Regions:
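Bimodal "functional hotspot" detector
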Residues: 1-212
Length: 212
């Protein structure tokens, strides 16, 4: 089971439901029928799962940098959130692509904010990942990770693929060419609808491409 950081609201909801089910089972075993009358367990949660208000988004906005979107996990699916990436003016295009990719990767591997955590957002992307541009002989839009894509958890790979594929780091065409810095193999991954809706069901669709 991959480690997903964040999503406190979702985790609490699962624990409450599990405890309620266990209690109902115990009552039934004692010959006591569970009540159908609504019970007051206190105020409802203040955050709607997987939704951030305009106020919440405003309080998180970084005043500088290139506005970008990354995909976090929420309720078992990929959901877009706003971030920003710092890119120095005048950065050469090939270098700019790698800088944006690293900024996106850093944003994905960072713990969600307190507001996002409360709303159920989480991430499976491990900290410490790095990304570089194409090696000699690679397609110009290739990106190479410090960890092989197929060695990442499915949730993490789905987050990375969909975030990169939807950004200037990969040409914003719905796919991204990924490999590792320790192997020659490259694959073009697609951010398919099923990848966004059920990232844990399998790796994103991919095809092998020529590399260095």
């Amino acid at each position: 089971v991959p480690e997903v950081r964040g999503g406190a609201a979702r985790a609490r909801g699962v624990r409450v439901l599990a405890a309620t089910g266990a209690l109902a089972g115990l009552l039934a075993g004692c010959g006591i029928r569970a009540t159908q009358v609504p019970t007051d367990f206190g105020p409802a949660p203040s955050m709607v799962p997987c939704e951030l208000s305009a106020t919440d988004i405003t309080t998180q906005t970084t005043p500088s940098g290139l506005p970008v979107e990354v995909f976090l996990l929420c309720s078992g699916a990929l959901v877009r959130v706003n971030r920003s990436v710092e890119v120095a003016e005048g950065t050469e295009e090939a270098r700019r692509r790698a800088v944006v990719a690293q900024g996106l990767l850093d944003a994905l591997s960072a713990d969600p904010s307190a507001i996002e955590d409360e709303a159920g957002y989480g991430t499976a992307v491990p900290p410490g990942l790095t990304v570089s541009g194409p090696a000699p002989g690679d397609p110009e839009d290739a990106l190479r990770l410090s960890t092989a894509p197929d060695a990442l958890a499915r949730f993490a790979l789905a987050q990375i693929v969909c975030t990169f594929a939807d950004s200037a780091a990969a040409g914003d065409n719905g796919s991204v060419v990924l490999g590792s810095t320790s192997a020659e193999t490259l694959r073009r991954y697609e951010c398919a609808p099923e990848t966004q809706s059920a990232p844990g069901d399998g790796n994103p669709p991919s095809t092998e491409v020529g590399g260095s």
